[in-house]
């Protein structure tokens, strides 16, 4: 796409770090050497305004054959103070294309938004300040857990952030205002379609977890549900039951609506 040459992984990561630094008075200091499970993993000390270490942030951004698809945040160690001060260790895992030679990784729009989204989850874990680990970081009601991540997405759509960090990977030229305006407009295009997809998926999730009868035919179950809800035939659910991992093995059972609720 036209905007991709301006969205190098390095630039977008720096945009995320700088946004967090300005919002929360923290700093990210790269760790040169540390034990890691793969060479692609990078690590950062997260430091507050008084130079106190508040957590460790790890990134594993590149796709590889042995890695599960998708993107997520994982807490290797939750913050707590119940039995002494325990600092969080948080990782963001993505599947961006790995660089070839000296070429930079160029992200598409979806990848850039994903980086900010998962970084929001990471900040939720890193900035946690609770006594008990059971309440730490993302261990909150599902109604709220997507709020920090959805909020962070807004910053990659912010003109000031884009103009500062979206620079051409070869020339260093800042993104032209006309191109930036086209990108921002594209984020608002066809929102009725996208919203209906999300609503349909949320209904499907709730239907699976409230249906008392045994479901023998998944396709028939879906068609009947969407007909009852008045889903236009031109629009399908964001997910079908057979690939809707969020609600069966992803911790979002009867809670997929929380994405829209957080928005």
Each PLM stretch: what is its role?
Residues 1-263:
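Cation-handling catalytic/transport regions enriched in His/Asp/Glu
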């Amino acid at each position: 796409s036209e905007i991709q040459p301006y969205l190098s992984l390095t630039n977008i990561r720096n945009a995320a770090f700088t946004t967090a630094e300005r919002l929360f008075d923290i700093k990210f200091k790269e760790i040169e050497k540390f034990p890691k499970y793969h060479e692609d993993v990078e690590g950062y000390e997260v430091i507050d305004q008084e130079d106190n270490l508040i957590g460790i942030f790890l990134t594993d951004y590149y796709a590889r054959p042995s890695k599960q698809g998708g993107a997520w945040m994982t807490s290797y160690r939750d913050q707590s103070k119940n039995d002494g001060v325990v600092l969080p260790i948080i990782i963001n895992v993505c599947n961006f294309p790995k660089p070839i030679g000296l070429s930079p990784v160029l992200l598409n729009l979806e990848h850039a938004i994903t980086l900010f989204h998962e970084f929001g989850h990471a900040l939720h874990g890193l900035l946690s300040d609770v006594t008990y680990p059971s309440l730490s970081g993302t261990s909150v009601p599902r109604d709220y857990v997507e709020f920090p991540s959805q909020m962070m997405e807004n910053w990659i759509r912010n003109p000031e952030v884009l103009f500062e960090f979206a620079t051409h990977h070869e020339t260093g030229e800042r993104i032209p205002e006309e191109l930036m305006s086209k990108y921002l407009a594209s984020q608002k295009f066809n929102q009725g379609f996208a919203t209906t997809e999300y609503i349909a998926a949320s209904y499907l999730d709730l239907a699976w977890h409230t249906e008392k009868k045994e479901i023998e035919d998944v396709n028939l179950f879906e068609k009947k549900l969407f007909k009852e809800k008045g889903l236009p035939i031109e629009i399908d659910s964001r997910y079908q039951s057979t690939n809707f991992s969020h609600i069966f093995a992803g911790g979002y059972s009867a809670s997929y609506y929380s994405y829209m609720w957080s928005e």
